[in-house]
Structures are given as structure tokens and as C-alpha cells.
């Protein structure tokens, strides 16, 4: 059981007060939308389970997390979760997602669904530039490749980190000491993180991040969102931890969505570190914005 691990974050669910508002926002971002009963199913260009399921609710709230596992690990996870006191149970809503369902000790629903391991959709980052006009070949519409990661606000930050490592086999890849824990799943070479925990007073959704191919696609995605009327955002920039390029847009409920590219990869030999001071790479963000806006948990306790 010591090597049992989820492979990656394959989806999440949000309760939202208006599915039409959600559809307009996420389709502007480049996701495909379809309606199923009282929920909105959103997918990237990647084939597989819906990366985002928006469910009709009274207000915006994090509804569930979904992680991909090997099909052969399903019975192993079921046994493992029972042993640690988090037995699997029925889905909170019929037909929501396939696989195993359980609640963590703080009440958040978690789904484990059998999927194939996600690979980067591009093999060569170096685009030949001899005798060609690159600008003429850039995409007219940005459609993200896949869901890369999401961050969740939580109370009991250290206990939650320990539980998610135990229950899901996630591995801490780096920490902003006392503030944020970045976590990776699976084995071999993979993204620096697929999930993260932000120290807060209670649970909540902070942001999700979707991969695109280049800095050009991030910039074009930012323009795409602004043209659609979603002008509250920041970037383009490069993070310190994970080193990825980014652009964030605020969603209609005060949380965030991100285009990202060019993230650090880690291997099984990677050693996590606690960082007490993190430099701003570029741009020079205002610390009060990062603290009061980006990390504001708007969900009720």
C-alpha cells in the first residue's frame, strides 16, 4: 500500500447559483459545455471525464474533487480507505462520476475514477522558426489541453496535508511555509503539482488551472476573456514555485481560473522544500493584492 497513489487531478465540482452564467464564463475560457439534468459538464480538448461539473446550488461552493487512478487500483484503494477510517460510499448525487466516492474527515467529497495517465499533448517545445511566419500560425481561438491543477482553501492545514498524503498517496513537492502546500500525484516525470492546499479558516475553492501550449496561447487566452467581458485578471507572469507562466481571470463568484504553460517537472527523486520567502519573478505583484484578492476565501463556513 505504500506506493498506492492517485495519478493526477482529473476534475472537480462546484455548486453555482446560475448555470447559464457558469456556461458563458467557461465557454469563453475555451471549455466545451453540455447540460445533463441539473448540472453543467465542462471538458477541455482532452477526451475523458468532465474536468469541471457545475451543479445548481444556492451559492458558489466547492462540491467535490476527482482524482484519476489506475483501474487495477480500485479494489486496493477501497481496502486502503476502509483501513484508515474513510470507507467508500454511494455518490452524493446519482450519475455524477464513475468510480469510488468517500468523504474526508472535514466533509469534502472525493471521487477516485479509473483513467489513463495524462501526458503532455505536445512533444517538442521548440518551434522551428526558419523561413516561416509564426504569427500567421497562432490559433484563432484558445481551447485548453487539459486540467492541470487546482488549489483548495482549508482549515487544519497541516492535518489536511498529512491526510491527503496518507489517503491519496499525494507527495508534497514544495511549500510556502505555513501558507501553501503544493502536491503531486503518480510517479515518474510529471507536473510540479496537480493539487494544493491554502491555509485558511475553512474549506473553499481558490483556483483551477488549465494547460495551454505556449506564452502566446496564454496571452491570446487573456485577450479572449477580456473580449468576452471578463476583464478582471492579472498576468502574464511567471511564478516562483513551479515556475509556470500564467494568466488569471476572476470568475463570476470571486475565485479564479488560470491558463498556464511551461511548468517545472519533477521526478521520484525530487525533494520538497519549505520556502520562507518567495521572490516575485515577473511581474512585480502587489503583496496586498496577492494576500487580500487572490487568497480571499469567499465561501461560507
Regions found by a protein language model. Give the residues of each.
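Conserved active-site tyrosine of GNAT-family acetyltransferases
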Residues: 22-27, 81, 107, 160, ...
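Non-heme Fe(II) oxygenase catalytic core, chiefly the N-lobe of the double-stranded beta-helix
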Residues: 116, 131-165, 169
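Conserved short beta-strand elements that form part of the metal-binding/catalytic scaffold
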Residues: 31-63, 71, 109-116, 171-206, ...
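Core segments of cupin and vicinal oxygen chelate
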Residues: 4-50, 98, 152-192
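Vicinal oxygen chelate
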Residues: 1, 8-17, 56-143, 146-155, 181-182, 229-301, ...
Amino acid at each position: 500500500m505504500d506506493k498506492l497513489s492517485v495519478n493526477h487531478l482529473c476534475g472537480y465540482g462546484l455548486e453555482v447559483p446560475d448555470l447559464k452564467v457558469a456556461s458563458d464564463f467557461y465557454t469563453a475560457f475555451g471549455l466545451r459545455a453540455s447540460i445533463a439534468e441539473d448540472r453543467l459538464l465542462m471538458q477541455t480538448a482532452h477526451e475523458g471525464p468532465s474536468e469541471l461539473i457545475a451543479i445548481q446550488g444556492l451559492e458558489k461552493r466547492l462540491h467535490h474533487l476527482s482524482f484519476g487512478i489506475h483501474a487495477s487500483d480500485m479494489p486496493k484503494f477501497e481496502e486502503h480507505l476502509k483501513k484508515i477510517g474513510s470507507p467508500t460510499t454511494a455518490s452524493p448525487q446519482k450519475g455524477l462520476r464513475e468510480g469510488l466516492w468517500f468523504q474526508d474527515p472535514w466533509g469534502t467529497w472525493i471521487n477516485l475514477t479509473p483513467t489513463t495517465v495524462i501526458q503532455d499533448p505536445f512533444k517538442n517545445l521548440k518551434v522551428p522558426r526558419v523561413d516561416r511566419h509564426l504569427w500567421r500560425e497562432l490559433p484563432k481561438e484558445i481551447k485548453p489541453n487539459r486540467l492541470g491543477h487546482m488549489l483548495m482553501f482549508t482549515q487544519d492545514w497541516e492535518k489536511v496535508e498529512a491526510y491527503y498524503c496518507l489517503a491519496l498517496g499525494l507527495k508534497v513537492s514544495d511549500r510556502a511555509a505555513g501558507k501553501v502546500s503544493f502536491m503531486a500525484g503518480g510517479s515518474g516525470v510529471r507536473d510540479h503539482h496537480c493539487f494544493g492546499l491554502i491555509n485558511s479558516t475553512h474549506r473553499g475553492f481558490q483556483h483551477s488551472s488549465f494547460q495551454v501550449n505556449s506564452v502566446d496561447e496564454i496571452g491570446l487566452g487573456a485577450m479572449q476573456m477580456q473580449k468576452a467581458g471578463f476583464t478582471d485578471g492579472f498576468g502574464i507572469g511567471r511564478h516562483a514555485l513551479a515556475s509556470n507562466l500564467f494568466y488569471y481571470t476572476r470568475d463570476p463568484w470571486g475565485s479564479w481560473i488560470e491558463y498556464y504553460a511551461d511548468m517545472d517537472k519533477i521526478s521520484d527523486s525530487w525533494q520538497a522544500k519549505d520556502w520562507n520567502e518567495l521572490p516575485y519573478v515577473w511581474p512585480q505583484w502587489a503583496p496586498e493584492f496577492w494576500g487580500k484578492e487572490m487568497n480571499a476565501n469567499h465561501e461560507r463556513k
